[in-house]
C-alpha cells in the first residue's frame, strides 16, 4: 500500500478546501500571470533546474508529488525531461492552472504528468501539485498515450456554448463517485462520441458511437475517491480532479474531463501507486 502520512493528509485537506471554496477573482490574476507561471514550470521540467522558479514562488510554497509533500529538488520536476506534448487549462476563479504533459521520446525517463499550480492573492505560486505516472503506473505506456492524445481536438469552446463551472465540476464528481455510489452513473452526462484514455488504454475507434461507458464500475461498494482537488476551465469545458484512489492501493490519481454541449467528450486518467505495480 502507498504510504500516506498525517502531514500530507492535512495539506491535502487544505488544498481540497481551497478548491471547493467559493471562487473569487484576485485583482492580480489574469491570463498573463497564469501563462507566465505555467511556462516557467514547463521550462523547469525541461532544464531540471528548480531554482529558475524562484521569482514566481511564494516564500511558503509547497511541492506535492503523488500526494506526498517532498523537496522539489528530489522530484520529477528536477529530472530534465523532453516534453513531447503539453496542454494547459486556466482557472481564473481560483487563480490556478492544470497542465498535462507527456515525455515519451526518452525511453529511459518516460512520464505522463498532470500538474495543478495555484497562486496566492499576491499572484505568487504557493502550490505545485503533481501526479507523475511512469513505469508501473496503471496501464502506463507514454508512447501509446502520446499517439492517442495528438489525435484529439481540444479547441476552445465558443463563448455561447460553454457550460458553467458548477456543471463541469458536477459531471466530474458524478463520474468519480461511481465506485462508491450505485446511482452516480445516472448523473454523468454521457456523450456520444466520447473517448476515455485510461493510462494508455483508449476506448476510441474514431467512430461516431465511441463511448466512455465500457468498463465503468459495476461494483459500487468500493472505497471512495477522496481528497479531491479541482482546476476548472470553462473555455475548455474541462475539470481536472486530483485525488486518492483508495480502492487501488491508495494511489495518486488524476482524472480530467471535457464537456462539449453539456455532454462528456473526453476522459484522461493517470494513476500512480507509490512506485509499485498498480493492482486492483
Q: Where do the PLM segments sit?
A:
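Fungal secretory targeting signals
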Residues: 1-27
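C-terminal and inter-domain tail/linker signature
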Residues: 20-280
Amino acid at each position: 500500500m502507498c504510504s500516506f502520512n498525517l502531514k500530507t493528509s492535512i495539506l491535502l485537506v487544505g488544498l481540497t478546501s481551497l478548491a471547493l471554496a467559493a471562487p473569487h477573482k484576485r485583482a492580480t490574476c489574469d491570463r498573463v500571470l497564469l501563462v507566465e507561471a505555467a511556462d516557467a514550470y514547463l521550462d523547469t521540467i525541461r532544464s531540471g533546474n528548480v531554482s529558475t522558479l524562484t521569482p514566481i514562488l511564494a516564500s511558503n510554497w509547497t511541492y506535492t508529488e503523488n500526494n506526498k509533500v517532498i523537496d522539489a529538488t528530489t522530484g520529477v520536476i528536477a529530472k530534465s525531461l523532453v516534453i513531447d506534448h503539453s496542454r494547459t487549462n486556466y482557472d481564473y476563479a481560483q487563480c490556478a492552472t492544470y497542465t498535462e504533459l507527456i515525455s515519451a521520446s526518452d525511453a529511459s525517463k518516460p512520464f505522463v504528468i498532470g500538474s495543478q499550480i495555484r497562486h496566492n492573492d499576491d499572484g505568487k505560486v504557493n502550490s505545485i501539485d503533481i501526479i507523475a505516472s511512469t513505469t508501473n503506473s496503471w496501464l502506463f505506456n507514454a508512447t501509446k498515450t502520446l499517439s492517442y492524445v495528438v489525435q484529439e481536438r481540444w479547441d476552445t469552446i465558443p463563448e455561447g456554448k460553454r457550460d458553467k463551472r458548477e456543471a463541469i465540476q458536477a459531471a466530474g464528481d458524478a463520474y468519480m463517485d461511481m465506485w462508491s455510489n450505485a446511482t452516480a452513473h445516472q448523473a454523468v452526462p454521457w456523450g456520444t462520441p466520447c473517448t476515455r484514455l485510461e493510462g494508455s488504454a483508449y476506448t476510441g475507434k474514431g467512430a461516431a458511437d465511441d463511448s466512455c461507458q465500457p468498463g465503468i464500475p459495476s461494483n459500487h461498494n468500493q472505497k471512495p475517491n477522496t481528497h479531491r482537488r479541482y482546476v476548472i476551465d470553462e473555455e475548455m469545458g474541462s475539470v481536472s480532479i486530483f485525488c486518492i484512489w483508495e480502492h487501488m492501493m491508495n494511489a495518486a490519481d488524476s482524472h480530467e474531463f471535457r464537456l462539449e454541449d453539456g455532454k462528456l467528450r473526453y476522459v484522461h486518467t493517470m494513476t500512480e501507486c507509490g512506485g509499485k505495480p498498480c493492482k486492483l
